[in-house]
């Protein structure tokens, strides 16, 4: 009986991993075992990065809103509280965009928030 080194399935699996490892330095792009470890690690980092990206963008939006709100004489937390009391449900991404691109509309929202806090 002839010796079988590895069949179609194994070859395809190894080629798939080596294709994913393309561009890695040295043995990480050439040798299957090392490449497999590098690919697994990179996929793990990619998964974690997708979660972190959401947090990072939310932090960025809050920082931008806070800066714009303080320019109008109100803190971020009081601004958000005033909007909630006024029943205005605009997400932080949109508030951030308004703070940067539409200063008049953002100023109007700040005034509404201030009125709700004083009432």
Swiss-Prot record:
GO terms for biological process: ribosomal large subunit assembly; translation. Gene3D superfamilies: 6.10.160.10, Ribosomal protein L20. GO terms for cellular component: ribonucleoprotein complex; ribosome. The keyword Lipid metabolism does not apply. Keywords: Ribonucleoprotein, Ribosomal protein, RNA-binding, rRNA-binding. GO terms for molecular function: rRNA binding; structural constituent of ribosome. InterPro entries: Ribosomal_bL20 (IPR005813), RIBOSOMAL_L20_CS (IPR049946), Ribosomal_protein_bL20_C (IPR035566). Belongs to the bacterial ribosomal protein bL20 family. PANTHER family: 39S RIBOSOMAL PROTEIN L20. Binds directly to 23S ribosomal RNA and is necessary for the in vitro assembly process of the 50S ribosomal subunit. It is not involved in the protein synthesizing functions of that subunit. This is Large ribosomal subunit protein bL20. It comes from Thermoanaerobacter pseudethanolicus (strain ATCC 33223 / 39E).
């Amino acid at each position: 009986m002839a010796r079988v080194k590895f069949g179609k399935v194994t070859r395809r699996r190894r080629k798939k991993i080596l294709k994913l490892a393309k561009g890695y330095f040295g043995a990480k792009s050439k040798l299957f075992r090392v490449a497999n470890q590098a690919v697994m690690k990179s996929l793990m980092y990619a998964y974690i990065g997708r979660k972190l990206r959401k947090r990072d963008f939310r932090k960025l939006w809050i920082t931008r809103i806070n800066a714009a709100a303080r320019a109008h004489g109100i803190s971020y937390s009081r601004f958000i509280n005033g909007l909630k009391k006024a029943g205005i449900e605009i997400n932080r991404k949109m508030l951030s965009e308004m703070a940067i691109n539409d200063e008049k509309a953002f100023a109007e929202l700040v005034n509404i928030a201030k009125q709700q806090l004083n009432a």
